[in-house]
Amino acid sequence: MSNDFISAESLIADPGRVYELVANAAALGPRLPGSAALRRFEEILATGFAASGLTVELLPYTVRSWVAREWSLSLGNGRPDAVVSGYYPESGVTALEGTTAPLVYIGTVEDADVIDDEIRGRLVVVDYPLRQMPLGYPACWGVYDRDQRVVPTEWEHGVKLWVPLEELRGRVASAGGVGLIAVWTGTCDVEVMGLYEPIRPPSAQKLLAETTAEGKRRYRPHPRTELPAVWVGPSGRDELLAAAAAGSEATLKLCADVHEAAPVNSIVATLPGMTEEAIVLVTHTDGVNALQENGGSVLLAMAECLARLPLESRRRTIVFACVTGHMCREVFEVDGKTPTLAECEGLLTQRPGLAAVAVAALGVEHVGSTEWVREGAEMIPSGRNGWAHCLTTSETLADVMLKALEGTDSDPVLVADGPIWSLAYPFSEVGVPSVSYGGLPAYLMAITPDSYLGRISKVRLSAETNALLRAVRALDGIPQIAH
């Protein structure tokens, strides 16, 4: 039985197929939790996997669907309305006419001084700085970049202060504040326009779970604070702080369509091999634009290709898991009342035997990104691809990924020995050798009219998909993979 790498031509008959799938998903609009767009995307994936002969299973959940429809900040007293760059998801809602109250500025999110008498009945303004943050990878397994660029040492999207901001929002609500206005600093309006942040606080699924004394994983209750909040770009800071210093009133409006117990599903599609040993490919279904998240489209394209191979050429079973709940504060059981674990924590909870047969797990997200750089008050394309990050603690997996990338248009990719993030993390925690793969550009979380489809490189998208296919074929032939 041969497990040699398979060429792109052999696996992707139509070079535009992956892009077509991504474009079709982007045309649905933001796939927010519980939205009609997400439900339609789930249908596309389930139907597509089944059409290729895979066994498809749906793991049902419910979520609180919270879709904003109108948001603004009017300063009054002849001042121009503030340019609101976005809203804080699931923060809270105002009446249709908005909430009018005096403004008060309390400093920076990390050291804001919340004094009840100064907060009560006011709209609270706080600075939210965008700072550089070191990557912090312990070691680098290798770099695939034919241009031999300088390897990045900092995260492109900077520090995310989601946790202190959420904690501050709770303190402001407890002190009687009626709204929160977070002002971006250290960036430009264009860079932060439309950002859907935070996707949930805390920002990692692992923080929504805990281990019991019996060694079982369970949901960790997460309190919800109903306090409407919006983001303002840096160009509006001076006017906003001047209004606050003058004790002026402003009107904050944040209206949303809220539906409890909206149905969602994780999709598990299985392509059988000659043995029960499994290679697991994971991504999430919910996302805000063509880049975040296009992993489901990539996995479907991979499944279509791999399903064309004869069974006897597939030693191991391949599991494609497109999980839900990545962008939710809470996910519930189908009763709509009982909080539960979702994403891959939920997958492993509902399918405890999966970890025992999994020989490797590959988390696939944010494929095909291009590089955009800040130039003054604008963001412009550099004409190059953005860096992709491939993280694994396994030297074997690092070697597989570097060889799979070689000779493709996937670069630049940094393959590092670093903490497994996001979807592959739960597999790594239970001892399954894992890889986290994806780009992390600053525009990753933006909702835009064109879904940032134009920031996807068709060439790179196809190349990365092919590299991942090559990696899967290589993993199929390795007898044992060290964690």
Task: Label every model-predicted segment.
Residues 2-3, 12-16, 20-145:
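Noncatalytic luminal/extracellular "stalk/propeptide" segments of secretory-pathway proteins
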Residues 130, 186-187, 285-287, 321-329, ...:
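Acidic, glycine-rich active-site loops and adjacent beta-strand->loop/helix elements
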Residues 304, 316-319, 442-483:
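His/Asp/Glu-rich mid-to-C-terminal helical/loop segments that flank catalytic regions of hydrolases
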Residues 85, 89-116, 205-293, 301-312:
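Soluble metallo-hydrolase cores and metallopeptidase-like ectodomains found primarily
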Residues 83-219:
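Extracellular/luminal Protease-associated
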Residues 274-276, 323-430, 434:
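Metal-dependent peptidase/peptidase-like ectodomains
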Residues 413-465:
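Zn-dependent metallopeptidase/amidohydrolase metal-coordination segment
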Residues 5-12, 26-36, 101-105, 138-140, ...:
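Second-shell loop/turn segments in exported
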